[in-house]
């Protein structure tokens, strides 16, 4: 790999090598790499400059929804598009189920599903890809809770708990939404919510009471 690629920065060498190993070596989940360059021209009296990084596969659960156009074809195309993201692979896909609209009820029923994927992307990078796929499917963000050709949401990302202006992980109020929990339960019944401490099965049972 290093013989066939040229880099100007040690960071890029380490990141590229880590990515190459994780993608090419079956079963490899995590790598830690340190690269040293002796007598690097950094303008400081140092004999060696080094960079150490750690990279790993992350597991994310994505909720899919559509209630405009040919929803089944749209969701199937979205699954394919997700699987084609660089350094990302879809592992499991739930059955697609028909559910009543949430929030704004004067609109067609939705077709919903969930999938599990492995990715080397960070959450913000993954969100950017989801937004791109939504846009390519014709998604327009006009009415909150309104009709949409495609809706893709990150429900879980490993056991990460994070909130920014752009995203919240785990997804806000996912524990109150049957259209998320039912397909998620099909593929990950024992996945535990990192904040509430309950499994998907337990959250779905609570919702049905």
Go through each PLM region and give its residues:
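Flexible, gly/pro- and Lys/Arg-enriched active-site loops
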Residues: 57, 102-109, 121-127, 131-209
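Extended accessory regions or peripheral subdomains of proteins
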Residues: 58-79
């Amino acid at each position: 790999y290093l013989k066939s690629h040229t880099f100007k920065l040690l960071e890029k060498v380490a990141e590229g090598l880590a990515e190459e190993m994780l993608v090419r070596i079956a079963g490899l989940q995590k790598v830690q790499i340190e690269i040293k360059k002796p007598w690097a021209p950094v303008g400081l009296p140092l004999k060696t400059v080094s960079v150490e990084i750690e990279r790993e596969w992350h597991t994310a659960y994505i909720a899919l929804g559509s209630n405009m156009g040919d929803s089944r074809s749209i969701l199937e195309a979205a699954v394919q598009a997700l699987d084609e993201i660089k350094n990302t692979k879809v592992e499991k896909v739930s059955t697609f189920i028909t559910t009543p609209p949430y929030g704004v009820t004067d609109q067609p029923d939705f077709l919903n599903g969930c999938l599990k994927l492995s990715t080397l992307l960070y959450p913000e990078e993954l969100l950017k890809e989801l937004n791109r796929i939504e846009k390519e499917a014709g998604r327009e963000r006009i009415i909150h809770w309104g009709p949409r050709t495609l809706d893709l949401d990150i429900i879980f990302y490993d056991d990460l708990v994070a909130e920014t202006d752009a995203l919240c992980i785990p997804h806000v109020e996912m524990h109150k939404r049957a259209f998320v929990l039912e397909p998620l339960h099909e593929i990950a019944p024992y996945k535990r919510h990192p904040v509430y401490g309950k499994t998907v099965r337990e959250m779905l049972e609570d919702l049905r009471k």
